[in-house]
Amino acid sequence: MASISGTMISTSFLPRKPAVTSLKAISNVGEALFGLKSGRNGRITCMASYKVKLITPEGPIEFECPDDVYILDQAEEEGHDLPYSCRAGSCSSCAGKVTAGSVDQSDGNFLDEDQEAAGFVLTCVAYPKGDVTIETHKEEELTA
């Protein structure tokens, strides 16, 4: 009900447009515009995406990497070749060194605390936690 100068007017006769009650109907739009993922049950999850800059011997490369994708996997998806062997964080083939930003590499078990504190990272088990710059091809420096 609405009131105009003390008179009550009913708005029930006005047509109503149907409202979207869930993002399930527009799941692709949600992901494209807002970085939202929608499962079959309509549950929405938010994912962040960060700028990753890799300094390789061939020159720097940059790409966007979601916070739930390993840096090595996203680099390969973008068409970049990086060294790797085990893809499980159990060797040093994919070693790099973080020069700016930070990563989550809690899935790996090869690096000790001192190596992680020195900035070493295994790109096969590293998720970006924000924009990050990594020097790649650091296996020799790590094992020296």
Swiss-Prot record:
CDD domains: fer2. Transmembrane segments: none annotated. Residues 1-47 form a transit peptide. Keywords: 2Fe-2S, Chloroplast, Electron transport, Iron, Iron-sulfur, Metal-binding, Plastid, Transit peptide, Transport. One of its GO terms (biological process) is ferredoxin metabolic process. Binds 1 [2Fe-2S] cluster. Belongs to the 2Fe2S plant-type ferredoxin family. This is Ferredoxin-1, chloroplastic. It comes from Solanum lycopersicum (Tomato). The lineage of its organism: Eukaryota, Viridiplantae, Streptophyta, Embryophyta, Tracheophyta. The gene is SEND33.
